[in-house]
């Protein structure tokens, strides 16, 4: 299967067959985040049953082979910061602004309305 052919959760699962169980869980949880919403590394870790693995979630997303299909730009730090290097953070900020996510003072303005 080619990356361009991926449309459904089942397609994502098939494409990620060579990833670890943890990486698949992280990427599938991230795949579910809708446009205009964000989650945090901590929330993803909790969602997949590994509540203390937020750094490992970040590492798995850093190796995301399906960006932007699996929208890792929608996962931010618990303080609304973008994380990563300055260039990557700026690109993520622009993508999120384009999707209608509120940004204030260089961070996502986290609220129950946009948290997934």
Give short role names for the model-derived ranges.
Residues 2-116:
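Nucleic acid-binding interface residues in structured DNA/RNA-binding domains
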């Amino acid at each position: 299967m080619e990356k361009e052919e991926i449309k459904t959760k089942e397609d994502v699962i098939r494409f990620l067959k060579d990833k670890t169980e943890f990486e698949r869980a992280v990427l599938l949880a991230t795949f579910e985040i809708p446009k205009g919403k964000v989650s945090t590394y901590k929330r993803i870790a909790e969602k997949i049953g590994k509540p203390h693995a937020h750094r490992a979630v970040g590492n798995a997303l850093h190796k995301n082979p399906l960006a932007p299909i699996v929208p890792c730009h929608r996962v931010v730090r618990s303080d609304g910061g973008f994380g990563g290097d300055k260039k990557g953070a700026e690109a993520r900020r622009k993508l999120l602004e384009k999707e209608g996510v509120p940004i204030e003072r260089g961070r996502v303005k986290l609220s129950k309305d946009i948290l997934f």
